[in-house]
């Protein structure tokens, strides 16, 4: 701005020579002399601004309004202007000014629990063991154990229902604690609890922070061993009940001779033997009914040796009229080259055309008959030629 005025005047002389001293701003060293001790604004602000006509005329409106506000501040009372002064520094005040803050310190009990009320680092088994060992008689009741823990550890004075349940469970499910009934001389409520005589090495060097090993009573171990030994026998008996004699899994390892011996003790087998006559060819109505009942009793899953053993000597099965058309009949299972041989043999034995014989059972069949005291009245041709040429493939019976 000053350079612009100098260019308009085009006068090389100094700017200070054009105005008098009372028409110019006074220096800052002169303004400090008129400032009061409790104020930061001078009282003659309005006089200074009015003595500068060249600035008041050239300044815009907002600047003049600011000057008016400054002038109004000068006319305010001296006390109000002093209240606007900036706050003094804290260094000017003595240290006693902040002493009141120490009175509002936080109570340590509100945010940090006392060490005496902290949870003890012992398990419930350790607490019970310590309580019993310090007792004079080395035995305590349940209520005495509760009271000992509460007196020694203030932490357990709260939530008593929770940790007392844990104490009861520890006493019941650990072999190191033995329940002792009350004697007649000491009547009262509740039994005594003591330590097992062999549980002395449960803690290392008397340190109850951690157990060395879990104590297990030898009697309980032997009881578990007996249960394990008896268990397979029970399972075997159950399997025998579920799978009767004569089914595939049992009859596969049984011989026809052994099956006949067992079948003789069976009620069905005995009735068949009693109904059977001296001749295997002659059948009575009673034996036919027994044979039919035995067929209904044992389904298709029966193996041949087990089936023959249960039926006994009555091997004359009831003829199925639809066996020729059945998909699993003997005519469907036999090969074409053996059809003619089978037809010739059936013509030679017209009375035994409904019998089903196997070559591998011929010797066992005679043994069974001789053991039971039955006379086998068969022709020599049947013994020599018929069983040697019979088809030996297993056949599914059509019931």
Curated annotation (Swiss-Prot):
A molecular-function term among this protein's GO annotations: DNA-binding transcription factor activity, RNA polymerase II-specific
Keyword Magnesium assigned: no
PROSITE patterns: FORK_HEAD_1 (PS00657), FORK_HEAD_2 (PS00658), FORK_HEAD_3 (PS50039)
Region (Disordered): 219-290
Main location: nucleus
InterPro entries the record matches: Fork-head_N (IPR013638), Fork_head_dom (IPR001766), Forkhead_box_C (IPR018533), FOX_domain-containing (IPR050211), TF_fork_head_CS_1 (IPR018122), TF_fork_head_CS_2 (IPR030456), WH-like_DNA-bd_sf (IPR036388), WH_DNA-bd_sf (IPR036390)
Tissue-wise expression: During stages 8.5 to 10, expressed in the part of the dorsal mesoderm invaginating the dorsal blastopore lip (Spemann organizer), as a direct response to dorsal mesodermal induction. At stage 12 (mid-gastrulation), restricted to the dorsal midline in the deeper layers of mesodermal cells. Continuously present in the posterior portion of invaginated mesoderm and expressed within the notochord. Also present in the midline of the neural plate during gastrulation, but absent from the notoplate in exogastrula embryos.
Matches recorded under SUPFAM superfamilies: Winged helix' DNA-binding domain
Induction summary: By activin, derriere and not2.
UniProt GO cellular component terms: nucleus
Basic and acidic residues: compositionally biased ranges: 219-234
Portion annotated as DNA-binding: 119-213
Keyword match Repressor: yes
SMART domains noted in UniProt: FH
Location in the cell: Nucleus
Regions of compositional bias (Polar residues) in chain numbering: 267-277
Keywords, sorted A to Z: Developmental protein, Differentiation, DNA-binding, Neurogenesis, Nucleus, Repressor, Transcription, Transcription regulation
Classification via Pfam families: Forkhead, Forkhead_N, HNF_C
An individual GO BP term: forebrain development
Stated role: Transcriptional repressor involved in embryonic nervous system development. Plays a role in the induction and patterning of the anterior-posterior neural axis. Involved in the establishment of floor plate differentiation from neural plate cells during gastrulation. Binds the anf1 promoter sequence to restrict expression of anf1 to the anterior of the neural plate, thereby patterning the forebrain. Can bind to the HNF-3-alpha DNA target sequence. Cooperates with t/bra in a dose-dependent manner to specify dorsal mesoderm formation, including notochord.
Name under which the protein is recorded: Forkhead box protein A4-A
Species, as recorded: Xenopus laevis (African clawed frog)
Gene name of the record: foxa4-a
């Amino acid at each position: 701005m000053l350079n612009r005025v100098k260019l308009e005047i085009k006068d090389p002389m100094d700017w200070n020579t054009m105005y008098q001293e009372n028409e110019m701003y006074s220096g800052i060293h002169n303004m400090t002399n008129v400032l009061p001790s409790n104020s930061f604004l001078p009282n003659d602000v309005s006089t200074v601004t009015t003595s500068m006509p060249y600035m008041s005329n050239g300044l815009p409106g907002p600047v003049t309004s600011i000057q008016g506000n400054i002038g109004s501040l000068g006319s305010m009372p001296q006390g109000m202007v002093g209240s606007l002064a900036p706050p003094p520094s804290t260094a000017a005040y003595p240290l006693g000014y902040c002493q009141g803050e120490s009175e509002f310190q936080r109570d340590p009990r509100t945010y940090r629990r006392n060490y005496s009320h902290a949870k003890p680092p012992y398990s419930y088994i350790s607490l019970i063991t310590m309580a019993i060992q310090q007792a004079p008689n080395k035995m305590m009741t349940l209520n005495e154990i509760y009271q000992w823990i509460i007196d020694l550890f203030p932490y357990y004075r709260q939530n008593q229902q929770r940790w007392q349940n844990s104490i009861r469970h520890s006493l019941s499910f650990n072999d190191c604690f033995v329940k002792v009934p009350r004697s007649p001389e000491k009547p009262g409520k509740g039994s005594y609890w003591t330590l097992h005589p062999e549980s002395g090495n449960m803690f290392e060097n008397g340190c109850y922070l951690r157990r060395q090993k879990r104590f297990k009573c030898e009697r309980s171990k032997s009881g578990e061993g007996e249960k394990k030994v008896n268990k397979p026998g029970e399972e075997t008996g159950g399997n025998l009940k579920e799978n009767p004699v004569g089914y595939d899994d049992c009859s596969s390892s049984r011989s026809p001779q052994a099956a006949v011996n067992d079948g003789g003790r069976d009620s069905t087998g005995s009735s068949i033997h009693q109904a059977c006559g001296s001749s295997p060819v002659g059948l009575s109505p009673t034996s036919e009914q027994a044979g039919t009942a035995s067929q209904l009793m044992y389904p298709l899953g029966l193996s041949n040796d087990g089936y023959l053993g249960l039926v006994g000597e009555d091997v004359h099965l009831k003829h199925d009229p639809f066996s020729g058309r059945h998909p699993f009949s003997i005519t469907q299972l036999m090969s074409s080259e053996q059809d003619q041989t089978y037809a010739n043999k059936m013509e030679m034995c017209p009375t035994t055309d409904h019998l089903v014989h196997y070559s591998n059972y011929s010797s066992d069949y005679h043994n069974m008959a001789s053991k039971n005291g039955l006379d086998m009245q068969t022709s020599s041709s049947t013994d020599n030629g018929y069983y040697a040429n019979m088809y030996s493939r297993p056949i599914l019976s059509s019931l």
